[in-house]
Each structure stands twice: as structure tokens, then as C-alpha cells.
Amino acid sequence: APEIAWVGQTEEQVKASGRPYKTGVFPFLASGRARAMEGAQGFAKVIAAQNDDEILGVHIIGPLAGELIAEAVLALEYSASSEDLQRTIHAHPTLSEALHEAALAADKRAIDSINR
């Protein structure tokens, strides 16, 4: 079973607050590293404020989620934006790319998945 880790608000909490927001989701199925590990279940999700891009929440369901969430905890602690995560170099192919890709997807700029 995949691990689950999160920090910050859920999408439901942000929606209930009335604050405009955007989300980016990256499925681990699109991660070469996750597929090689036979751990392609789950996703990484970034929730950011629409107006100033501040990260409001990050949710990871997938391989090593408990390890991967540390970057998101730091991002929230320092009021980072999804663009801050987008500009951070993530090695390829790694599981940590999932957070990078989810941040890119929030602005419809994902590299390894479909932009919706």
C-alpha cells in the first residue's frame, strides 16, 4: 500500500474558506522512478493561493511519501510559492520530481504529465 503524507490545508478547507486557489496534481504513474520501483500508485498534489501563489497545502500518496513531504513542510514554513518549487532543481529520475511536477501543474506547465 502507498504511504500517505500531508502538510497544510486540504482542498476542501481552502474551498470552504472562500479563498481563490489553484491545484496541481502529478500522478506517480507518470514517474519513471516510481514505475521502476513498481510503486506507481498515487499522486502528489500542491494547493496554492490564486492571488499570490503561496503554497497552502501539499498532499502525497505514493512511494516514500513520508520522506518526500519534508520539502513541502519547509516550503510551508517559509511561505514559499508554487513558483519557488518550480524553480528548485530536482534530479531526474527521482521520486522528488513529483512535487516539482505538481507545482508546475498548478500553472499548467507540467513536463511529464498532462496539463489540465
Residue map of PLM features:
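Flexible, glycine-rich terminal cap/loop adjacent to redox cofactors
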Residues: 1-116
